[in-house]
Amino acid sequence: MSGLEAIWWRERPGPLGALAGAPLLLAEAPFRAAAALRGALYDRGLLPAARAGAPVVSIGNLAVGGAGKTPAALAVAARLAGRGRRVAILSRGYGAARADARVASDGAGALLPAAEAGDEPALLARRLPGVAVLCGPRRAELARTAVESLGADALVLDDGFQHRALARDLDVVVLDASNPFGNGHLLPRGPNREPPSALRRAGLVWLSHADRAAPERLEALRALARDATGRAPVESRHAPTALLDGALREAGALEALRGRRVAALSGLARPAGFLRTLEALGAEVALARAFPDHHRFTAGELDAVLREAAASGCAWVVTTEKDAVRLDPALAAAAGDRLRVVRVDAELLRGADVLEAALAAALAAAPQPRPAPRAPVA
């Protein structure tokens, strides 16, 4: 985590932290004004929101990175597919070398590597067979492709809360219950793209890491969610579900980490959560190397971490599945048995019935696609 990010996520920065962030206060004011103006233009219909021709469920957040949005998107897409829907996920594709519209998966299998699709689309494509994944900056264009070319009849808009150019039938906003708003400021002074008052646009609040939140904070967030949306929130924890090798194949039970001395390698917005996961699994984290979010590890970086791990007596270098999909297959193969990957999924603690009801209402309320016009009779 960089020095700036440390200021962002420190809820009570103290005098030195406040002083370090003071120059950014001047930049926060125009960002706040621009965000408010843009929101008002959409609220009043002066900026249009395109209809997709299929129900759209947006998964987003208020802050930048690390809220647990990807596990939530996985869970929502799986539940929609379980209802018999032909699902497509629309993603910005952060971390990709390309910025054009592209199909990462047509539902039959991954078509693009993470370097071209972005790490989150690559992960979603790998984890969700039968679900199409499209990526690019213009999500309305992706929606048309998904509906018209791939036959999708339910769309999941990944990181979509601020992407209001595409209309949606349900806005799910994910908050990290352990630290939902950081220092409370907007970019660049803080981590937030919008203030908490923006939750009034949401249809459902999802509290990730609810198991790590203090009881009084959890109660306050539940009240905030009900006041904003009229619904109780969904609450989840990041549950480790599999231990994989560098090629993302099963590599034994998670219990194998218990008592093992390991090195943690990550490129995440908030790497501390990954360290807590490893410690909860009983691993002894002797070494931790954290890179910026969406970072693609080079051969030199991976080799250096492997050497440090060996020198520290570590059995494995352990990384996340999102990091592993970015890893060049040749590098993963070279690491061999020295590399392990922990998969996590969103385990719902409360609100499964609320989620199902919200999805059902969104599917029922969405405008149905217009039938294609009949050809004139000769």
From Swiss-Prot:
The protein's name: Tetraacyldisaccharide 4'-kinase
Alphabetical list of NCBIfam families matching this protein: lpxK
Pfam families found in the cross-reference section: LpxK
Gene assigned in the entry: lpxK
SUPFAM superfamilies noted in UniProt: P-loop containing nucleoside triphosphate hydrolases
Top-level EC class as recorded in UniProt: transferase
Reaction catalysis annotation: a lipid A disaccharide + ATP = a lipid IVA + ADP + H(+)
GO cellular component: plasma membrane
Gene3D superfamilies for the chain: P-loop containing nucleotide triphosphate hydrolases
Keyword Nucleotide-binding: yes
An individual GO BP term: lipopolysaccharide core region biosynthetic process
PANTHER family noted in UniProt: TETRAACYLDISACCHARIDE 4'-KINASE (PTHR42724), TETRAACYLDISACCHARIDE 4'-KINASE, MITOCHONDRIAL-RELATED (PTHR42724:SF1)
Family note: Belongs to the LpxK family.
Chain positions recorded as ATP binding sites: 63-70
Entry's Gene Ontology molecular function annotations: ATP binding; tetraacyldisaccharide 4'-kinase activity
Domain of life: Bacteria
UniProt keyword list: ATP-binding, Kinase, Lipid A biosynthesis, Lipid biosynthesis, Lipid metabolism, Nucleotide-binding, Transferase
Organism per entry: Anaeromyxobacter dehalogenans (strain 2CP-C)
Enzyme Commission number: 2.7.1.130
InterPro entries assigned: LpxK, P-loop_NTPase
Primary role: Transfers the gamma-phosphate of ATP to the 4'-position of a tetraacyldisaccharide 1-phosphate intermediate (termed DS-1-P) to form tetraacyldisaccharide 1,4'-bis-phosphate (lipid IVA).
Pathway participation: Glycolipid biosynthesis; lipid IV(A) biosynthesis; lipid IV(A) from (3R)-3-hydroxytetradecanoyl-[acyl-carrier-protein] and UDP-N-acetyl-alpha-D-glucosamine: step 6/6
Lineage per the UniProt record: Bacteria, Pseudomonadati, Myxococcota, Myxococcia, Myxococcales
Protein's UniProt keywords contain ATP-binding: yes
